[in-house]
């Protein structure tokens, strides 16, 4: 099997189009429980969580990876209203 290298010159369509409008579940962070491990930032596939642990809901797809990776369960997924 051969390897193929590539460079992404432009972000995918997520940055061009707000995708948060069709989300079913929404992450909520309890900052009192947060231990600043930054797992949520590291594992978010859309890069929707900033250094202050604010979530950009315009682009969050509600996948729940941030909640799954949080070691202290400071992020809860709630049904979108």
Curated annotation (Swiss-Prot):
PANTHER family: PYRUVATE SYNTHASE SUBUNIT PORD (PTHR43724:SF1)
Temperature-related properties: Optimum temperature is 80 degrees Celsius.
GO molecular function, one term: oxidoreductase activity, acting on the aldehyde or oxo group of donors, iron-sulfur protein as acceptor
Binding site for [4Fe-4S] cluster 1: 34, 37, 40, 70
InterPro entries: 4Fe4S_Fe-S-bd, 4Fe4S_Fe_S_CS, PorD_KorD, Pyruvate_synthase_PorD
Native species: Methanothermobacter marburgensis (strain ATCC BAA-927 / DSM 2133 / JCM 14651 / NBRC 100331 / OCM 82 / Marburg)
Protein name per Swiss-Prot or TrEMBL: Pyruvate synthase subunit PorD
Keywords: 4Fe-4S, Electron transport, Iron, Iron-sulfur, Metal-binding, Repeat, Transport
């Amino acid at each position: 099997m051969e390897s193929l290298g590539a460079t992404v010159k432009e972000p995918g369509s997520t940055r061009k189009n707000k995708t948060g409008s069709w989300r079913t579940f929404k992450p909520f962070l309890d900052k009192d429980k947060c231990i600043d491990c930054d797992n949520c930032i590291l594992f978010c596939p859309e890069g929707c969580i900033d250094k202050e642990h604010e979530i950009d809901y315009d682009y969050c797809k509600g996948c729940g990876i941030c909640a799954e990776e949080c070691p202290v369960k400071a992020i809860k997924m709630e049904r979108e209203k």
